[in-house]
C-alpha cells in the first residue's frame, strides 16, 4: 500500500502536546508535510516557548511517523514563533514588545515580586525574549532580586537602555534613585514616571514584558491598566482570607478595564518544617484554588513558604537561575509555561498589518 499524507497525519495525530492537551495536527502547528518515497519531513511551529520540551516532542513525532508502513527516514523541524496577541481595546501595542503580562496582587507581602522575577526567568530559560519592568515605584525590588547595580545609559539623552542580567532586560525606578531614598510622590507624578519608564526604555524585541505591578488597586494600578496594552494579568495571593479578599478586588479591577486574567498563583500555600518534615497550612488551605474555581480562572499552581526562595531572591540569584532543576524552579517553570500557552491561545493582534487612517478636512 502506497504511503499517503492521510495515513501519516492520522499517525501524527496520536501525539498530544501535553501543554494544550491537543495534537499538533488539529492545532495546525504541524506544517509543510513532505513525502518523498520513504522519506518524510515536516515542521512544527510552537506559539509558546518550550526549549526544554522540543527534544521530547521531536522524538515522539518521529516515532509516530515511523510506525506507518513504508516510512524509512523522518526529519522533524520544531521551532518557536511567539507573536503579538490582542490587548485591551483602544490601547496600541508598544513597538518591540509583543505581549505585556501584569503580575499583580491586591495587597503587599504575598510574594508578587518574587513570583514576577521567577516567571520572567522561567520564560527566558524556555527560549523567549523577556523583559521585566519594576512598576512598584514606592518599593522597587527588582534591581536587588536580579543582582543588577548601576544606572541605565542613554545614547540620545531622551531614552534609556534597559539593564540586563540572566538574559532578561530590566528597568526599574530603583536604577535611577539612591537605594535608601524614599519616593515621596503623589499618584499622578508616580504614574507619569512609570509611563516614562515603560515607553522611554529601548526594549530590544521582546516576546514578553513582565510587569511587576504595585500592590493594591489604587490610582497608579488603575491608570496602568487603562493605558498599558496588557495581554493579560497573573494574580498572586496567599490562602489567607484577608489576602483573598484583596485579590478579588484586583481581579475586579482588571475585569473592568478589559484585561483578561491568565491565572492565579497561590503563594505560601504550605510550610514544611526543614527539621522534621511536618506540614502545616499557616495561612489556611486551598484558599487560592477555591477562588480560582469561583471566578472561572486557571489555577497556575501553589508554592510553599520556603526559606530558600527568599534567600535566593535576596542574594540576587532567584530560584530559577540559582537552582534551575530544583523542585521550586520546576514549579515556576510549569507556571510560566501555563501562562505562555494561555497567551498563545488568545486572539492575535493584527493592528500592525493595517495602515493607519487619517481623516482631515479639505483646506
Q: Where are these predicted regions, by residue range?
A:
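N-proximal, solvent-exposed amphipathic alpha-helical segments enriched in charged/polar residues
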Residues: 1-31, 68
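Short, non-transmembrane amphipathic alpha-helical segments
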Residues: 5-8, 29, 36-41, 45-75
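Short, basic phosphate-binding NTP loop
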Residues: 27, 74-98
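Walker A/P-loop phosphate-binding motif and the immediately C-terminal alpha-helix
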Residues: 100-137, 251
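Phosphate-binding loop that captures ATP/GTP phosphates
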Residues: 123-185, 191-199
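Switch/coupling sub-region of P-loop NTPases
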Residues: 169-224, 235, 244
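Conserved catalytic-core segment of NTP-binding enzymes
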Residues: 207-208, 214-315
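C-terminal boundary of histidine-terminating zinc-finger modules
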Residues: 315-326
Amino acid at each position: 500500500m502506497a504511503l499517503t499524507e492521510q495515513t501519516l497525519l492520522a499517525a501524527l495525530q496520536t501525539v498530544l502536546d501535553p501543554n494544550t492537551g491537543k495534537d499538533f495536527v488539529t492545532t495546525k502547528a504541524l506544517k509543510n508535510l513532505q513525502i518523498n518515497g520513504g522519506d518524510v519531513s515536516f515542521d512544527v511551529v510552537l506559539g509558546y516557548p518550550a526549549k526544554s520540551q522540543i527534544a521530547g516532542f521531536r522524538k515522539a513525532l518521529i516515532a509516530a511517523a515511523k510506525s506507518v508502513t513504508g516510512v524509512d527516514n523522518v526529519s522533524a523541524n520544531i521551532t518557536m514563533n511567539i507573536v503579538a496577541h490582542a490587548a485591551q481595546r483602544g490601547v496600541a501595542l508598544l513597538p518591540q514588545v509583543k505581549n505585556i503580562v501584569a503580575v499583580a496582587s491586591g495587597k503587599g507581602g504575598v510574594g508578587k515580586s518574587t513570583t514576577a522575577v521567577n516567571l520572567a526567568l522561567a520564560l527566558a530559560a524556555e527560549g523567549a525574549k523577556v523583559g521585566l519592568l519594576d512598576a512598584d515605584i514606592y518599593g522597587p525590588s527588582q534591581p536587588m532580586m536580579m543582582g543588577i547595580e548601576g544606572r541605565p545609559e542613554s545614547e540620545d539623552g531622551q531614552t534609556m537602555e534597559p539593564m540586563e542580567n540572566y538574559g532578561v532586560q530590566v528597568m526599574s525606578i530603583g536604577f535611577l534613585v539612591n537605594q535608601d531614598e524614599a519616593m515621596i510622590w503623589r499618584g499622578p507624578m508616580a504614574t507619569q514616571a512609570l509611563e516614562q519608564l515603560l515607553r522611554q526604555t529601548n526594549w530590544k524585541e521582546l516576546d514578553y514584558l513582565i510587569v511587576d505591578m504595585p500592590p493594591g488597586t489604587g490610582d497608579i494600578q488603575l491608570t496602568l491598566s487603562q493605558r498599558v496594552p496588557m495581554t493579560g494579568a497573573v494574580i498572586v495571593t496567599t490562602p489567607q482570607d484577608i489576602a483573598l479578599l484583596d485579590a478579588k478586588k484586583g481581579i475586579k479591577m482588571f475585569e473592568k478595564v478589559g484585561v483578561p486574567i491568565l491565572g492565579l498563583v497561590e503563594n505560601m500555600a504550605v510550610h514544611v518544617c526543614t527539621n522534621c518534615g511536618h506540614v502545616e497550612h499557616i495561612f489556611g488551605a486551598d484558599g487560592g484554588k477555591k477562588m480560582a474555581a469561583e471566578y472561572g480562572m486557571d489555577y497556575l499552581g501553589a508554592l510553599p513558604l520556603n526559606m530558600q526562595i527568599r534567600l535566593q531572591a535576596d542574594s540576587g540569584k532567584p530560584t530559577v537561575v540559582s537552582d534551575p532543576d530544583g523542585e521550586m524552579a520546576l514549579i515556576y517553570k510549569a507556571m510560566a509555561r501555563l501562562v505562555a500557552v494561555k497567551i498563545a491561545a488568545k486572539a492575535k493582534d493584527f493592528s500592525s498589518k493595517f495602515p493607519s487612517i487619517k481623516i482631515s478636512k479639505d483646506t
